[in-house]
Each structure stands twice: as C-alpha cells, then as structure tokens.
C-alpha cells in the first residue's frame, strides 16, 4: 500500500470519482476533478523547476486553490509549507527564508502586503497568483505565474521518484518561546495519521467534515487527509464569528467538526438550533473545560465527543473514547492506533501507575524533527532505549515535554508542561498541584 499524501486523493478518485471531495462557498469539486487538478499542478510545478524536496509555500485562506496547491506540491515531489493566513509580513518572511522556499502561492492582496519583505527571501524565484494578474507589483528577479496556467493540462511530466519516508510538509509552530519551529513531516507520518484518526472516529464516505482550523496546524490539515482517506467530503470555512459555524453545520449537514478549546467555549455560549447531522465532534490543542463539555453535551445529546491530546512532533498521541468521559472526565485517554505512549522517569525507566513522568511517543507518527534546528531536534527526538538489544540501529521516539501520569487501566492524565514545573525543597511540583492546595 502506498503511503503518499497525494495518493489519498488519487485512490479515492479511482474508487468513487463522482463523490464530492471539497466544498467551498457552495462550489463543489468531486474526486475526479480534484485529482485531475492536483495532477496538472504537479506536472506544471515540475516543468517550472520545482525539484524533489524543494519547498513550496501557500499563503492563502482556505479555498480550492489552497488545497490543490498543497497536494500538487506533494505530487511533484516537493515539500509544502502552509503559512497561517493571519501572520504578518515579517512572520511570513521568516518562514520563507528559514526553509528556503522556492515557490509561493498567494493572492494579489496578500502579495501587496509582502512587497517589502519578499526581496529578503533569496531562494524564492516564482510566485503563483490565484486571482487577477493585472495589478501585480514589480519585484525584481521574481517570476509571476497565473493560477490558470499552473492548472492547465500539460501532459504527463515525469518527476523524481517519491517514497513514503520523503519529506512532505513543514508545519511551523510558535512554541512557547522564541522563533517558530518548523516541524518536518514525512508522507508516511501524514497518511498513517489520517488512517489512525479515521479508524477511531469511524469515518465513512457519507461523512461531511467541516474544516474551520488553519491548514498550517496539523490538527487542521488532518481534516483534509481524514476526509480524503475515507472518500468523505471536506467543507472549507473561513469563519469570522462562531455563529457562522453553526449556520454552515445546518446548511451543509456537517457530520464531523474539529475545534480547539477557545472555539468550543465560544460555541457553547451560543444558542443552537436542533442539529441532527453532527455525528461527532473532537477537541485537541488543550483541555476542554468541564463546564464547556457539560454544555456541549446538553446542546448535542446525540453527538459523540472525542477528547484528544497531541503535539506537532507526533501529530496525535491519545484519545478518550466518548463512553469513557463520565468514568474518567479528566483523562486524555489512551494511545491512538499505530502508536505507543509511555510515561518515563528522567532516567528513562517506566513510571508506575499514579507516578508523574514525561510522556514519550513512539511509532509511525513520530515526525522527522525540526527544520534547520539540530539542537532542539536532539533534545526532543532521542533514541528509544526499551527496544530489543539485538537491533543494530536505534529507533527514534519523541519526548513531549509534558508531565503526565497513568492510572491502573493505562489511561493518561495531563499534569502540566515540564517547563512550568516549580522546584521547591528538592521536589518538582506542578502549578496544578499548588492550585489544588
């Protein structure tokens, strides 16, 4: 089985060409149309000189062109870099320079915001503009290509061979301090992530998944890959107000919605009409407050709620099944499929139930490390010491930096970030423990 990102679309197009793949502002693209567009973009990118492992950035809101450009870059053998559309020009410039972006896909309005910073990006040679090219700014040494040209049929252009351990994406996260870090994901990381999540969410082709989170966020991008893996439909939204999300859920008969705690808090404060289509909702990116959880369960009594924990370096680590919420409401759950999660002491030995330690993640979802940052990569990505001693090479696991504990049944509980721990009288104490006292 191929674990290549773009082949999620190709396979679904072969099996169900007429099913809707993407919906944006009421305009639909079925899998056959989407697959053809991705192939055309890939061929033209290769013709433009995008080589294997070179980076293509997309600085756009969610729209059809955004998705096609990202998956087209992967199909060309390149590495896609989705840039959060709310970032300021200096932040965009940092990302373009840090990972040596060669090609940028954007709009005229956004391009005009970047006029002063793009000359600072020495590796950038081509800008693809998704709308009118009549009022383009003049920027020396840059080649401007209209989107229609990139999407035009060009015949089959053979690119480099791609394998699933190749880089597929670099996702930038701000982290807690300093400059944003670029997490490098392989094709295998992304595809196995889609398969794993779809397995426990029980996604099917009749699902309609609403994409409200930024595609620069692994949790947001996964809404696309999970949909494409299962031949479901992904509905793109660039909402300004939470109330708009409720209207889209009604209008598009949405069956799956992923969000983060701040958005769930806002949604829980609104008046909802009766919603019958919403089969499940998911939470990640932080703990959902218990009051918000109770309110949402009252608003959506027939909707399954999945509470999840993850971090960009390993995508998703744990989930709490809906039937466990009442039994252990503060738990972040157990390991998702294709993953093992351990709680380890500082010396690398395994903690006993109830004992606090660091969450360590191993398996197919462990990413390739941080782009251009060997020092931080070596701290978080380290050899896993509990493997069979006869193996000649060491497996790399990722140390989360999060303090957790497990119960006797193996369910995990988040305590705090390790950099938030307070040392007193020789002991390390979490802020949560102090608050409880």
Residue ranges and their predicted role:
Residues 2, 17-18, 128-129, 144-145, ...:
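Conserved pre-ATP/AMP-binding loop-to-beta segment of ANL
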Residues 2-5, 10, 18-63, 67, ...:
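Conserved AMP-binding/adenylate-forming core of the ANL superfamily
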Residues 26, 111-164:
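ANL superfamily adenylate-forming
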Residues 30-32, 161, 168-192:
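Conserved AMP-binding A3 loop
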Residues 35-40, 152, 183-204, 212:
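Conserved structural elements of the adenylate-forming
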Residues 87, 104, 249, 257, ...:
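AMP-binding/adenylate-forming catalytic core of the ANL superfamily
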Residues 191-208, 215-256, 270:
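Conserved AMP-binding/adenylation subdomain of ANL enzymes
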Residues 254-259, 268-328, 340, 350:
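Gly/Ser/Thr-rich phosphate-binding loop
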């Amino acid at each position: 089985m191929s674990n290549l990102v773009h082949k999620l679309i190709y396979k679904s197009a072969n099996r169900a060409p007429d099913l809707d793949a993407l919906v944006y502002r009421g305009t639909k693209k079925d899998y056959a149309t989407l697959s053809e567009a991705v192939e055309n973009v890939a061929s033209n990118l290769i013709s433009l000189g995008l080589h294997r492992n070179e980076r293509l950035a997309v600085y756009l809101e969610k729209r059809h062109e955004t998705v096609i450009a990202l998956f087209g870059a992967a199909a060309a053998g390149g590495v896609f870099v989705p840039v959060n559309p709310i970032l300021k020009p200096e932040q965009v410039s940092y990302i373009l320079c840090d990972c040596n972006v060669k090609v940028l896909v954007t709009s005229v309005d956004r391009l005009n915001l970047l006029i002063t910073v793009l000359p600072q990006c020495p590796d950038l040679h081509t800008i693809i503009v998704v709308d009118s090219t009549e009022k383009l700014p003049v920027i020396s040494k840059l080649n401007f290509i209209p989107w229609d040209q990139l999407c035009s049929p060009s015949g089959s252009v053979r690119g480099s061979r791609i394998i699933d351990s190749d880089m597929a994406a670099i996702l930038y996260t701000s982290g807690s301090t300093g400059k944003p870090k670029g997490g490098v994901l392989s094709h295998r990381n992304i595809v196995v992530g889609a398969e794993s999540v779809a397995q426990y969410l029980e996604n099917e082709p009749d699902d309609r998944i609403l994409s409200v989170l930024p595609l620069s966020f692994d949790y947001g991008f996964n809404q696309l890959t999970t949909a494409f893996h299962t031949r479901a439909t992904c509905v793109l939204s660039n909402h300004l107000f939470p109330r708009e999300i409720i209207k889209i859920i009604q209008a598009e008969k949405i069956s799956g919605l992923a969000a983060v705690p701040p958005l769930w808090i806002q949604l829980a404060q609104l008046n909802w009409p009766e919603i019958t289509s919403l089969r499940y909702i998911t939470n990640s990116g932080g703990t959902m407050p218990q009051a918000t959880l109770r309110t949402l369960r009252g608003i959506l009594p027939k909707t399954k709620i999945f509470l999840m924990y993850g971090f960009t370096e390993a995508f998703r680590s744990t989930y709490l099944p809906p039937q466990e919420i009442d039994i252990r409401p503060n738990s972040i759950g157990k390991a998702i499929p294709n993953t093992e999660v351990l709680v380890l002491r500082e010396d690398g030995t395994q903690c006993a139930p109830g004992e606090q330690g660091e969450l360590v993640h191993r398996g197919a979802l462990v990413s390739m490390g941080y782009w251009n940052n060997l020092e931080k990569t070596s701290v978080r990505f380290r050899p896993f010491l509990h493997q069979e001693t006869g193996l000649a090479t060491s497996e790399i696991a990722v140390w989360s930096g999060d303090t957790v504990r497990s119960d006797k049944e193996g369910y995990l509980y988040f305590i705090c970030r390790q950099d938030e721990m307070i040392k007193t009288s020789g002991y390390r104490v979490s802020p949560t423990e102090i608050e409880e006292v």
